[in-house]
Amino acid sequence: MAPKKTTKKGGPKKRPSAEKRILTAQKRNLINQSFKSKAKTMMKKFEAALKAGDQTSISSGLQLVYSVADKAVKRGVFKSNKAARIKARATLRANAKV
């Protein structure tokens, strides 16, 4: 492990704000990517439930899609219009199967 950089007074060396913003953006990007992947997985599970035709799995899958889409908006991963589109399409597909 590399030695820690310190200032003349012995405290930790301060990072320029641009460098810090790059690091935080990279961290957020990883978190957002994992959440997007989770959302896609839930949508695929919902599609599988639609193909199976089981009513209970369709309704629970639809609830999961709604939940994940709303959480993504709350976290800032999706814009609200994208979540609305996802939920509307899922509802249309679920109603078509009923």
UniProtKB/Swiss-Prot annotation:
Residues 1-15 have a biased composition (Basic residues). GO terms for biological process: translation. The keyword RNA-binding applies. One of its GO terms (molecular function) is small ribosomal subunit rRNA binding. Keywords: Ribonucleoprotein, Ribosomal protein, RNA-binding, rRNA-binding. Residues 1-21 are annotated as: Disordered. Signal peptide: none annotated. Gene3D superfamilies: Ribosomal protein S20. Belongs to the bacterial ribosomal protein bS20 family. This is Small ribosomal subunit protein bS20. It comes from Chlamydia felis (strain Fe/C-56).
